[in-house]
Regions:
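Structural signature of tandem alpha-helical TPR/SEL1-like repeats
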Residues: 4, 29-36, 64-73, 98-110, ...
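Alpha-helical solenoid scaffolds that mediate protein-protein interactions
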Residues: 6-9, 41, 77, 111, ...
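Structural marker of alpha-solenoid helical repeat scaffolds
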Residues: 9-12, 44-46, 80, 114, ...
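Residue-level recognition of tetratricopeptide repeat
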Residues: 14, 23, 48-50, 59, 84, 93, 118, 127-128, ...
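TPR alpha-solenoid repeat register
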Residues: 17, 53, 87, 121, ...
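C-terminal soluble interaction/assembly domains
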Residues: 172, 178, 182-195, 199-201
């Protein structure tokens, strides 16, 4: 019934109806049908819906075709939406998964340029530099900026803790990581905390 209704929608609501149609098909794992519905949404339609459709398409392609195809689709969408911080952010996440750190850094910096208050972008950039490069001072600057913007974000607290660990500030690292775990019981945070305890020689707590 929902599909019948969506197919009859005309005018300004056509793009929203197509997005809803794609959602319905995706819930049934009918990926090709979902992609066809998304492809009916044109660049000159409602910007928020066009952006959401581009992100949705990338998620489907990631599920069905892999990181490279999804990344290429996002890049294609960015040609018509170069000021979408969400598209730049998702492109960065995929670039990192493809081990293309330079491209990930580019997209995260573009997202920050578009929205200087984008805490998650600062955090992702800082954490990526911390893990993938030797630019620890630069990583620290981005992570601290993220923390100033959103000090109760568990993922940012995790980054603060991991940064402190890399700087051999183990007590501070434990504080940040425990604060993160109070907000979000996440495996990666537990693993970071365990590594801090192990490095300290506290194997009982590490276990």
């Amino acid at each position: 019934k929902a599909l019948d209704y969506a197919s009859k929608v005309k005018g300004k609501l056509t793009a929203a109806a197509a997005l809803q149609t794609a959602n319905i098909y995706s819930r049934e794992s009918k990926w090709d049908d979902a992609l066809k519905a998304l492809d009916t949404i044109k660049e000159d339609q409602e910007p928020a819906i066009v952006e959401e459709a581009a992100l949705f398409k990338a998620r489907i392609l990631l599920e069905t075709k892999g990181e490279k195809t999804a990344f290429d689709a996002l890049n294609a969408s960015l040609i018509s939406m170069p000021y979408s911080k969400a598209l730049h952010y998702e492109a960065a996440m995929l670039a990192e998964r493809l081990d293309d750190i330079k491209t990930a850094e580019f997209h995260l910096k573009k997202a920050i340029e578009i929205d200087p208050g984008f805490a998650n972008a600062y955090n992702s950039l800082g954490y990526t530099l911390l893990e993938q490069t030797k630019r620890i001072k630069e990583a620290e600057r981005y992570i601290n900026q993220a923390y100033q913007l959103d000090p109760r974000n568990p993922y940012i607290l995790d980054s603060k803790g991991w940064l402190a660990f890399k700087q051999k500030k183990y007590i501070k690292a434990i504080e940040y990581l425990n604060d993160a775990l109070k907000l979000q019981k996440e495996l990666d945070i537990y693993l970071h905390l365990a590594e801090v305890y192990w490095t300290q020689g506290n194997k009982r707590k590490a276990a």
